Amino acid sequence: MKLKELESCLQQVDGFEEPKILLEQYPTSPHIAGCMLYTIHNTFDDIQNKLVADLGCGCGVLSIGAAVLDAGLCVGFDIDEDALDIFRGNVEEFELPNIDVVQCDVCSIGSSYAKKFDTVIMNPPFGTKHNQGIDMQFLQTAISMATSAVYSLHKTSTRDHIQKKANDWKVKMEVIAELRYDLPASYKFHKKKSVDIQVDFIRFTPT
């Protein structure tokens, strides 16, 4: 499947109706989701026939993309029932048999799913405002769940901090791409229509 085809497919995925600020629910755009998944699939062969987890899956754009690219099974994990209702609606719309969903607090599931997945993909909360450090909790959980690789988005400004953590956790960290994440003005306190954030697309692998 070409990148453009994947992107236009992901444009059909319904997003958040009322994003929740406490959960830092910012949508992953079809463009960014498409670029991530296309690279994971074509460069690293970490989706097709693999067991894939999507942490903080929200309405499911990464999960659905992974399922469309023939993941053996993709399981989305999220705490928010409203987002998961939209996720389930999207799955029905796409008629995908290789996708499942679990409602849970992502930060508390690592031990239950230790090394149960080949690949973990995620666009975690950036850990700003109310949730300082949650990005690292997501990452630590993801690393504990994956046997092959974790793919994640993180603010470029936190790269040195993440590298230090990766060294502590004895995982290899590779910045695959630097992306501009267009953050839509989805909350009332956002003054501008949208804000560009520099984001690293990172691959973590066991050493």
Swiss-Prot record:
One GO location term (cellular component): nucleus
UniProt keyword annotation of Nucleus present: yes
Record entry for activity regulation: rRNA N6-adenosine-methyltransferase activity is inhibited by zinc.
GO biological process terms, semicolon-separated: positive regulation of translation; rRNA methylation; stem cell differentiation
Organism superkingdom: Eukaryota
UniProt KW keywords: Cell projection, Methyltransferase, Nucleus, S-adenosyl-L-methionine, Synapse, Transferase
UniProt keyword annotation of Nucleus present: yes
Molecular function via GO: nucleic acid binding; rRNA (adenine-N6-)-methyltransferase activity; S-adenosyl-L-methionine binding
Task performed by this protein: Catalytic subunit of a heterodimer with TRMT112, which specifically methylates the 6th position of adenine in position 1832 of 18S rRNA. N6-methylation of adenine(1832) in 18S rRNA resides in the decoding center of 18S rRNA and is required for translation and embryonic stem cells (ESCs) pluripotency and differentiation.
The protein, known as: rRNA N(6)-adenosine-methyltransferase METTL5
Organism: Danio rerio
